[in-house]
């Protein structure tokens, strides 16, 4: 189990350090602890999966107190966050998100949000990936209501119980208002319909 009160929490995402989701997650984390740090990509890195920037030098920028950006991937952010930004004391917990869009089924293999939690797992730190689904085609109108309403309680419950050190947690919120959520379910990873995995050619040889 993880004691959230006064825990050292490292937060990242794949939507960028100024994205709405990571700001919401940071605010929720700060309800548990003052020792909350954000190290996140300077620009959106959705679909980066578990890539590490071996070929490029990375620029770490302090954007505000305990808020850093890196011109790299979410996994870069976890690696540098642990080894440099928080080198005096490792984080007790890693939170990755809140992602714009769900991370379920085979999509988890593409996700930078998921990969950041996996990087934390590799480094033997309890890690949780968090995603907020939205209605198809309405990413700009995403509602964070269910995340805001339920996440604090879910984090409290799962960290109190704890989980196997060889797994990370993956939380997904539906795109309905919180009063429409019927239950919270613990489940296993499923499969998606691959018929929509089509890459369209918009112009000649332009995809």
Language model region names:
Residues 15, 44, 73-74, 99-102, ...:
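Short glycine-rich anion-binding loops that position phosphate/pyrophosphate groups of nucleotides
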Residues 142-207:
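Electrostatically charged, flexible surface regions
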Residues 81-88, 115-126:
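Alpha-helix C-terminal capping segments
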Residues 3-9, 23-84, 88-90:
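A cross-family phosphate/adenosyl-ligand binding-site feature
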Residues 12, 39-41, 96-99, 129-131, ...:
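Short beta-strand segments
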Residues 102-111:
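Glycine/threonine-rich flexible loop motifs
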Residues 15-23:
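Short acidic, Gly/Ser-rich segments with clustered Asp/Glu that frequently serve as metal-coordination loops
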Residues 121-143:
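Glycine-rich phosphate/pyrophosphate-binding loops
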């Amino acid at each position: 189990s993880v004691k959230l009160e006064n825990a050292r929490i490292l937060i990242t995402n794949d939507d960028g350090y100024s994205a709405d989701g990571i700001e919401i997650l940071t605010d929720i984390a700060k309800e548990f602890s003052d020792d909350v740090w954000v190290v996140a990509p300077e620009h959106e890195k959705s679909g980066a999966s578990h890539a590490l920037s071996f070929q490029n030098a990375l620029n770490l920028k302090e954007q505000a107190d305990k808020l850093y950006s890196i011109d790299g991937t979410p996994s870069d952010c976890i690696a540098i966050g642990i080894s440099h930004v928080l080198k005096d004391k490792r984080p007790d917990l890693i939170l990755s998100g809140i992602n714009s869009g769900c991370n379920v089924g085979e999509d988890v293999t593409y996700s930078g949000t998921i990969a950041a939690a996996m990087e934390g797992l590799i480094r033997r730190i309890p890690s949780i990936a968090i995603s907020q689904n939205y209605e198809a085609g309405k990413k700009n109108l995403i509602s964070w209501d269910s995340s805001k309403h339920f996440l604090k309680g879910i984090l409290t419950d799962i960290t109190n119980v704890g989980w196997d050190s060889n797994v990370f947690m993956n939380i997904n919120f539906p795109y309905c208002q919180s009063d429409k959520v019927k239950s919270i379910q613990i489940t296993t990873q499923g499969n998606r319909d691959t018929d929509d995995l089509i890459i369209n050619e918009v112009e000649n040889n332009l995809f």
